[in-house]
Amino acid sequence: QDAKLPLVDEVIEKDAKYRECLKEVETLKAARNKLSKANGPLFGQLKKCDDEAKKAELQAQIDANNAAVKADADKMAELEAEEAKLAERIQEIMYTIPQMIDPSVPIGPDDTYNVEAQRFGEPVVPDFPIPYHTEIMESFDGIDMDAAGRVAGNGFYYLLGNIARLHEAVLAYARDFMIDKGFTYVIPPFMMHGNVVQGVMSFPEMDAMMYKIEGEDLYLIGTSEHTMIGRFIDQTLDEAALPLTLTSYSPCFRKEKGAHGIEERGIYRIHQFEKQEMIVVCRPEESADWYEKLWKNSVRSEE
């Protein structure tokens, strides 16, 4: 909260210059129109005039007006080019400025600065060695990571038999749990255009996460949040229709670039997975309350 915000300062500065350019362009347009309009009567007078001296005077006035119009047009072209450049930079910055965070959120460079907000139940520590999750799955012949590695490389796996059925059952449970909470179930597109990607994440995040379809303006989603939020791009919502409470299922695809060292064993850091998501579109003043409801839904779904 106390950090310097150079990007915010820059966008404010660029916005002020952009508005000044707009103002100057409008002023020049008005002056150009006035001069062009003034030439009409002068041409009429010139056509009817027999006095050579008067004709020369009228022609000189017309030429002066035309020269002024030309000068205004050249200046307008410069200003409009600057205006476009400023607008592009403003948009670039706006894509990278995140939402405001709650004052209670701890500030720090990484997740080691996180604090425990609330605890539900107490962890049970058994008196025997705890097998790793993939060891349990392998004991049921429920996972084949070696074959997946040969087929697609690291970060993929086959689920088999009852483990595959359990996977589907958990997804169905999560879906029905949210539907019972009054959320509308949605299956969104699993790909999206680049402008939607830019609207939901920064370029460094996009580069680290997203798979791009070669030769197409399409990206595989890293989470259904992307297309769920993208559904409202360029839309104005009726406040009376809020809140919109939505729950979505999707497969998710992530490069996991730069994630090395963050629990790489097993099926944590993988390139393909499925999940159930919660999305609420609400009034800003209701955001904190909905956040509380959403994380409580996550806890209760696991009880």
Q: Locations of the language-model features?
A:
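TRNA-recognition modules of translation machinery and tRNA-sensing kinases, especially anticodon-binding
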Residues: 119-302
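N-terminal alpha-helical targeting/anchoring segments
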Residues: 1-123, 138, 142
